């Protein structure tokens, strides 16, 4: 895959004179720059009953405007929130479905609620192979993003140890808009736009979206990302407030980047880079754009369907909503947010499986089963599936590898409503801000999944191969594989789940003195789960000429029905003390529960709890803003589900583990502006996350102790953060901002036994922004030094015990150096 940063730089050089000729000189009235990545003077709306100044918040919150988001130039939502303190994010999985952890909670993001305008697009962030992250795509319609870590999160949202709220644009009296084009050396072409303004007396509109095509940051053999979204907010003013109707349509396909083999398992010092590029390589194959998936129908009979690997994670999401905001003369205010959504998703991905295997040893391990199945068998040999020609393992250093195709269909429908009443009371000389609310939701999800394991040559974008049996005359008598498939029906699931929930809540802010404020809140959630799933057995699909169907997961024709009713109570309490107008301290304790996901039943109900405690200080000086927080998190139980692929059968085998996690730490966000032309900003987190009391849940409810006490959770660094300078200057009619951002991620482990180490790494990003009147031109370069590093090992096999080596031989790399040129016209 080519990278052409010089071409992009040349485009910038050529574009600048043209802009200089057409644009008027920049003036403060035309465009006004922001003070920095972090500002305590910003009003926030997340985590509180009413909007408040960020300096007044009694909890850790980071707020970024659209302009500040643009300067960060995030690759995806995970990289955006990962730039904030207290949040560790892995953004290397692609556009969506990445990993992010809040203050060491190792749940891959299901304890963080992603919202748009104060309400989540789906009530459960942990969907079936999707997260609400995939339903929220930042574009020019985003006005700001606010991230609350801990604090009041469990009062104002369900399953929330943190809230990430994207605030969208609303129409106003003054029309405005922008058009943006983005091109990148990954084959990226993107067009964004929005317009907002007044339609008629009392009616206002904001509408916009994007379309995008991207070949991808790694070579998958076809376009990685293709699609876009459109959304609108239509507002009507009322006598005491406003009514806003919201709508959004998303239709987007995204590749899911997997770990790749890096070293030869027979000689772990030998790199596989000649076979698969460590930066851009994947095992994805264009040959699987017409994959024939054979699986069990509802009654156990074989069925065949064509799937397309290039569809990736294809999400079609439709949203309608209505937000009512009223302020009455008697001091009461009312807010009601109602949404109805539908998601239709197909998911096609080739998952990483076991490490590469010696081709001769692989064939020998299948010889006994082949001898038993095919009388007259004399030898085994490899051929390419597509044309039947001989495959010589010497062409891939004697290696073959397996990959598992996962094909899924998901439909999710939801309705949610959040009603709040707010009023300020004076009582005994003190003031109380009371918020009364009730959140209710109904959501249903159906799913249908088929797994099929393939045998591949060991190289980048491989072809599928077959291992066939021959008699003494060279005639084919059967196959270990068929059509490249090692095992049909490696896994098979289907079902539907229905969930309803109701959550009344109350929060009070008590202004005790001019300097001291106390806050408390409680939320009680009641869930009702009903679900069915197909019962399964293991059997044969009736293919006499192959071993590949001998251990298929088959439906029996019967259904298992489950039911569960459960309730949880979340709470928070905190204080804020302003020592003076520029220095404040705060403290907070909270408890949040992660309610069971859809389909839960009495046999598997398991409700993790996050107890969070924090103590922080805030500094708001003329040239320095600081938000520093010491925190402690206890997460129990810590649930781990692994789905490894058996190297002998190719079937998926699941195991469940349970333990506890504690995480003391410190997070810091700061901006220092020593001069008008210089700004320095930093976000830093240190946490000492440890696992204890880990057990494996085995047959009949028994447990087996796994000795990992005191170890770090897999893929969790102790130290991570970013920092960098920004220079601001003017040359003639052009205003410039140039910045460097240094990012550091500390040592992590691929496994809970802490045997396979993911080395610490650092990267450097550069950004050049030039403004002239209504024009912005921005050049962003990520991983400037082309650092190679890994964000994970191979979770299908190494979550508990590692890869048998100190350094990983299989892993998912960060993206190589890449650049983007962004041109925006504001009007």
Regions found by a protein language model. Name each.
Residues 235-237, 242-319, 346-410, 465-497, ...:
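Acidic/polar loop-and-plug regions of large Gram-negative outer-membrane beta-barrel proteins
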Residues 144, 151, 163-198, 205-220:
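Short strand-turn segments of transmembrane beta-barrel domains in outer membranes
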């Amino acid at each position: 895959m080519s990278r052409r940063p010089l071409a992009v730089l040349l485009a910038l050089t050529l574009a600048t004179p043209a802009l200089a000729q057409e644009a008027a000189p920049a003036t403060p009235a035309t465009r006004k720059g922001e003070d920095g990545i972090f500002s305590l003077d910003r009003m926030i709306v997340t985590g509180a009953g009413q909007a408040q100044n960020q300096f007044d918040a009694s909890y850790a919150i980071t707020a970024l405007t659209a302009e500040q988001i643009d300067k960060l130039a995030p690759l995806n939502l995970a990289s955006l929130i990962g730039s904030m303190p207290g949040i560790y994010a892995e953004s290397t999985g692609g556009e969506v479905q990445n990993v992010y952890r809040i203050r060491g909670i190792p749940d891959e993001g299901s304890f963080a609620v992603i919202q748009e305008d104060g309400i989540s697009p789906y009530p459960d962030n942990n969907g079936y192979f999707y997260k609400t992250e995939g339903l929220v795509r930042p574009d020019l319609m985003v006005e700001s993003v606010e991230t609350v870590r801990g604090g009041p999160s469990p009062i104002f949202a369900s399953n929330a140890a943190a809230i990430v709220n994207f605030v969208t644009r609303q129409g106003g009296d003054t029309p405005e808009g922008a058009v943006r084009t983005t091109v990148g050396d990954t084959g990226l072409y993107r067009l964004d736009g929005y317009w907002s303004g007044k339609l008629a007396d009392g009616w206002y509109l904001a509408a916009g979206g994007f379309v995008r095509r991207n070949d991808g940051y790694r070579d998958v053999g076809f376009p990685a990302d293709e699609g876009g979204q459109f959304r609108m907010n239509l507002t009507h003013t009322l006598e005491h407030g406003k009514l806003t109707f919201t709508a959004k349509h998303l239709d987007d396909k995204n590749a899911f980047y997997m770990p790749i083999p890096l070293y030869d398992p027979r000689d772990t010092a030998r790199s596989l880079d000649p076979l698969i590029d460590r930066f851009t390589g994947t095992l994805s194959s264009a040959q699987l754009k017409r994959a024939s998936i054979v699986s069990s129908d509802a009654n156990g009979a074989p069925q065949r369907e064509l799937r397309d690997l290039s569809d990736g994670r294809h999400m079609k999401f439709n949203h309608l909503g209505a937000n009512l905001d009223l302020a009455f003369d008697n001091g009461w205010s009312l807010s009601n947010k109602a949404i109805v959504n539908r998601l239709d998703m197909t998911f096609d991905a080739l998952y990483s499986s076991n490490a590469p295997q010696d081709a001769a040893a692989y064939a020998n391990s299948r010889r006994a089963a082949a001898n038993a199945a095919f009388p007259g068998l004399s030898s085994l040999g490899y051929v390419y599936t597509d044309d039947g020609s001989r495959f010589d393992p010497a062409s891939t250093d004697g290696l073959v590898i397996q990959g598992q195709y996962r094909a899924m269909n998901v439909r999710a429908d939801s309705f949610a409503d959040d009603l709040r009443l707010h009023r300020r009371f004076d009582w005994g000389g003190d003031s109380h801000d009371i918020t009364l609310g009730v959140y209710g939701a109904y959501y249903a999800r159906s799913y249908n999944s088929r797994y099929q394991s393939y045998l591949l040559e060991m190289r980048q974008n491989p072809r599928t191969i077959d291992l066939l049996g021959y008699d003494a005359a060279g005639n084919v008598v059967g196959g270990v594989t068929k059509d490249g498939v090692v095992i049909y029906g490696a896994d098979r699931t289907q079902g539907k789940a229905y969930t309803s929930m109701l959550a009344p809540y109350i929060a009070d802010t008590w202004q005790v003195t001019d300097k001291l404020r106390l806050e408390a809140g409680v939320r009680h959630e009641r869930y009702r789960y009903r679900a069915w799933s197909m019962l399964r057995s293991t059997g044969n699909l009736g293919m006499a000429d192959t071993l590949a169907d001998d251990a298929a997961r088959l439906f029996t024709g019967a259904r298992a029905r489950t039911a569960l009713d459960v309730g949880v109570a979340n709470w928070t309490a905190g204080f804020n003390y302003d020592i003076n107008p520029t220095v404040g301290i705060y403290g907070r304790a909270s408890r949040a529960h992660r309610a069971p996901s859809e389909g839960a039943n009495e046999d598997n109900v398991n409700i993790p709890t996050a107890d969070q405690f924090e103590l922080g200080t805030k500094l708001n000086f003329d040239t320095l803003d600081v938000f520093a927080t010491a925190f402690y998190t206890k997460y129990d139980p810590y649930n781990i589900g692994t789905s490894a692929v058996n190297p002998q059968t190719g079937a998926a085998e699941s195991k469940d583990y349970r333990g506890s996690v504690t995480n003391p730490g410190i997070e810091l966000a700061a901006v220092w502006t020593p001069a008008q032309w210089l700004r320095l900003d930093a976000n830093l987190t240190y946490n000492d996350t440890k696992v204890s009391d880990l057990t494996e849940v085995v047959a009949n409810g028994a447990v087996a102790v796994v000795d990992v006490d005191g170890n770090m959770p897999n893929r969790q660094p102790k130290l991570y953060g970013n920092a960098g300078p920004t220079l601001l200057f003017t040359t003639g009619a052009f205003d410039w901002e140039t910045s460097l951002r240094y990012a550091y991620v500390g040592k992590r482990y691929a496994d809970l036994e802490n045997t396979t180490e993911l080395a610490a790494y650092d990267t450097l990003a550069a950004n050049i922004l030039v403004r002239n009147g209504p024009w912005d031109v921005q050049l962003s370069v990520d991983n400037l030094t082309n650092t190679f590093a890994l964000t994970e090992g191979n979770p299908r096999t190494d979550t508990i015990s590692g890869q048998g080596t100190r350094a990983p031989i299989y892993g998912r790399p960060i993206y190589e150096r890449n650049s983007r040129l962004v041109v925006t016209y504001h009007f």
